[in-house]
Amino acid sequence: MIPGEVQVAAGDIELNVGRETLSVSVANHGDRPVQVGSHYHFFEANDALVFERAPTRGYRLDIPAGTAVRFEPGQARTVQLVAYAGKREVYGFQGKVMGALEGRA
């Protein structure tokens, strides 16, 4: 093995199998590009992104870890989101949750 080399099993790797997903239409009404990373709590994404926020609470982009989606000014697109797993607690970002996703508005 070479240092830093990644060896994966043969065949396709499916991400987020069996997780709840959601499709959302998003538009960038800002004057600058907005980039959202793979594990960013989409509910708390930049306010220049216009979409129905309430249903996205507890969801992130359904894309490979370490990647992002960029929304250019004036651009609209539909993205696939996937529910957070594990403890389902969210801290940081814009500070809109700061704890458990369930049982809080």
Curated annotation (Swiss-Prot):
Subcellular location: Cytoplasm
UniProt enzyme class: hydrolase
Annotated InterPro entries: Urease_beta-like, Urease_betasu_sf, Urease_subunit
Keyword annotations from UniProtKB, A to Z: Cytoplasm, Hydrolase
Biological processes per GO annotation: urea catabolic process
Annotated metabolic or biological route of this protein: Nitrogen metabolism; urea degradation; CO(2) and NH(3) from urea (urease route): step 1/1
Catalytic activity: urea + 2 H2O + H(+) = hydrogencarbonate + 2 NH4(+)
Pfam families: Urease_beta (PF00699)
CDD domains for this protein: Urease_beta
SUPFAM superfamilies (UniProt xref): Urease, beta-subunit (SSF51278)
Keyword Cytoplasm: yes
Gene Ontology molecular-function annotations: urease activity
Annotated Gene Ontology cellular component terms: urease complex
Principal subcellular localization: cytoplasm
Enzyme Commission number(s) from the entry: 3.5.1.5
Matches recorded under HAMAP family: Urease_beta
Similarity comment: Belongs to the urease beta subunit family.
Quaternary assembly: Heterotrimer of UreA (gamma), UreB (beta) and UreC (alpha) subunits. Three heterotrimers associate to form the active enzyme.
This protein's name: Urease subunit beta
Phylogenetic placement of the source organism: Bacteria, Pseudomonadati, Pseudomonadota, Gammaproteobacteria, Pseudomonadales
